[in-house]
Amino acid sequence: MPALILPLIEAAGHWPARGSLLGLDLGTKTIGVAVSDPDRRLATGIETVARKAFTADAQRLLALAAGRNACGFVLGLPLNMDGSEGPRVQSTRAFARNFARLTELPIGLWDERLSTAAVERELIANDVSRAKRAKIIDEHAAIYILQGALDRLATLNRAD
């Protein structure tokens, strides 16, 4: 059975109470990957996957998830500033649909507006060279996306 693809809050209801989540930042050339601790408090970068073909990319992501006993994925959804969906969102949703056929782990979609821009500003503020930024930007964006999702989930859990 294919994985569920839901907004983050709805997906959280399908994940066990504990277990790592993998955060993904889909770029056109690379996929940034981050992982949470099992208690879902802190996101840490794993790697930047150079995109090749969908099947190869998906197999790498599934191997990373299995190696960290992940129970779900958080996929950054690049909405436009006004909240509308453009071509990048359509591409992300298509990736999610295809990826869901290969796993049963629920996929949560999380608004990632300005994540790459925020990370870029932070790296520049820390005097990271342009060449180094290009190599790590997607992984850091995945950390930013996953940490934002973890923080939102923690807020919901406190409200319960």
UniProtKB/Swiss-Prot annotation:
<keyword id="KW-0690">Ribosome biogenesis</keyword>
<dbReference type="Pfam" id="PF03652">
    <property type="entry name" value="RuvX"/>
</dbReference>
<comment type="similarity">
    <text>Belongs to the YqgF nuclease family.</text>
</comment>
<keyword id="KW-0378">Hydrolase</keyword>
<dbReference type="InterPro" id="IPR037027">
    <property type="entry name" value="YqgF/RNaseH-like_dom_sf"/>
</dbReference>
<dbReference type="GO" id="GO:0000967">
    <property type="term" value="P:rRNA 5'-end processing"/>
</dbReference>
<keyword id="KW-0963">Cytoplasm</keyword>
<dbReference type="InterPro" id="IPR005227">
    <property type="entry name" value="YqgF"/>
</dbReference>
<keyword id="KW-0540">Nuclease</keyword>
<dbReference type="GO" id="GO:0005829">
    <property type="term" value="C:cytosol"/>
</dbReference>
<dbReference type="InterPro" id="IPR006641">
    <property type="entry name" value="YqgF/RNaseH-like_dom"/>
</dbReference>
<protein>
    <recommendedName>
        <fullName>Putative pre-16S rRNA nuclease</fullName>
        <ecNumber>3.1.-.-</ecNumber>
    </recommendedName>
</protein>
<comment type="function">
    <text>Could be a nuclease involved in processing of the 5'-end of pre-16S rRNA.</text>
</comment>
<dbReference type="GO" id="GO:0004518">
    <property type="term" value="F:nuclease activity"/>
</dbReference>
<dbReference type="InterPro" id="IPR012337">
    <property type="entry name" value="RNaseH-like_sf"/>
</dbReference>
